[in-house]
Amino acid sequence: MADVVYPLASSTWGTEEIEAIQDVIASDMYTMGRRVKQFEQEYADHFDHGYAVMCNSGSSANLLMLSLLKLKYKLTGDIIVPAVGWSTSYFPVNQNGFKLNFVDVDPQTYNIDTTKIEQAITPNTCAIMAINLLGNPCDFDAIYKIADKHNIFVIEDNCESMGAKYNGRYTGGHGIIGTQSFFFSHHMQTMEGGMVTVDNQEDDDWLRSLRAHGWCRDLSPENPLFHKTGSWKDNFTFVTPGYTVRPLEMSGAVGSEQLKKWEEIMSARLKNKEHFFNKFGDEKYLKLQKTQGESTWFSFGCICTGALTGRRDELVTALTEAGIQSRPLASGNWLRQPVMNMLDYTATGDYSGADLIEDEGFFVGNGMQDVTKGIDAMYEVIQKLI
């Protein structure tokens, strides 16, 4: 196999992150503590969220989000979801007793097709999950027009779209709850880590209890769940059916260092994006992802068309042989995954957008590193194919 000349992801770490980890080790406090709390506040302030609760992954963030809907808001029924997304966007829906209600995606933006949401709504629909795919914001004007009409909640999986904006507002803050991931391939990397964002103290308290055993020791003094008496038993009082999805203290320390690099990270990503679109924006054999709002370009999504129609797998093989890494768009049409026979869901109507992404779609990487030479190499591979 050829050496990698264009990776899907690369590290955003430098000596600062290593030193931050060493400081935590020297403190002899490895579990969630002061550095996690510091990063939570810094993240909330930077991206204009009221409150931010860190956990051990974006997947766990989604689990906490759905648990909050069930336990605090007492919602039941089905939740509208797009047919293209990630596994742990969907699984927590069922794990919290909700039914998945699939709607097709727009093959240009890869996000939920807002023209098809209303026809999927049932008397039992309680929420719409907006997944901002590959850095691209959903059409929240259209989503909220429908949600307000039917009096249903909007929640937001923003794990791939940190820092994106729609109508001047950061994604992750358009729904009543938003989630974020800090996995290696994402905009900021704590390697493993996630965040849930909300805009009120009550939700914040619920999330902090759900995050750690269901106990009350992390709750604010005026929390709605338990009146602390000051007794030694307070720290061993359990008020929600919680999990154990706390982050490590090291992850919080690294997150603070990563946030300092945010402008540098985004500058590099946008430069890579300009080069990619200069190379492929006018070509007739690839349709590139269409943005709405301000995308933060998690990666570069492509759909084979023209001379490459039906040749996606051939192209992927050629790219791999040239050292250019690629992968499916998210997980393709989720309805075609074998795990569907274990899930509780509704799927009606047309899924041609998701099918096109499944059959003709792929993406290549973007990140803090300069990938322009890799983009040039990709262009040369394609020129030899067509």
Where are these regions (language model features)?
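PLP-dependent aminotransferase class I/II
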Residues: 36-41, 49-53, 59, 104, ...
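Adenylate-forming
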Residues: 190-194, 255
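N-terminal "arm"/small-domain region of PLP-dependent enzymes with the aminotransferase-like
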Residues: 1-29, 34, 236-239, 364-365
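Phosphate-binding glycine-rich loop
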Residues: 29, 34-78, 92-94, 102-104, ...
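PLP-dependent aminotransferase-like
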Residues: 70-149, 153-158, 165
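Conserved active-site segment immediately N-terminal to the catalytic lysine
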Residues: 156-190, 205, 232-237
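Structural preference for beta-strand elements that scaffold enzyme active sites
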Residues: 153-155, 177, 361-363
